[in-house]
């Protein structure tokens, strides 16, 4: 299954090309979910979501919609995965409503660029994560891109986050029964979009779910690209 969207939805500048011109801000997510079937939430990086907030998200989206969420910075940037059992359990517990509704996609653990590879640290942290919750790791230091790290991810069914970066080339390696793409360029040519669709199609052919998120911008290109990708996959 392909889940495609952007890293956010609250952008008035997406009117009228993505949202109808008269769409009020409180209806953005509801309209977004009629065109795309997933979104990546960065809000959770700084704050734990309240039950009221999650209930609103759930009510605004249809069955089959998925919210992928960025793990809280206390886990990834303050503790840097070390001695983070209590924080991780608390964070995952805060997502319980999404889990119960069947709308939790993937939890993204985005590590700081100065954090170098530490296989023992990663192994210990992976041991904290419940198998029922999909996890992906965005490594932003190239020392992490080793077979030892890939093996640890495979053993935990955790995905290597395939994130675009001007400073780093992430190897296109599958380590789980799903893949996770963070596409950060502001624009993609028709040829690039076609190549991307072929890559995603190959993953789907191997029965891997694909979570694909374009960069959020004040203009709607990313959302439109995601919609095009869904149409290609369906077609």
Descriptions of predicted regions:
Residues 1-235:
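Residues lining hydrophobic/aromatic ligand-binding pockets adjacent to catalytic sites
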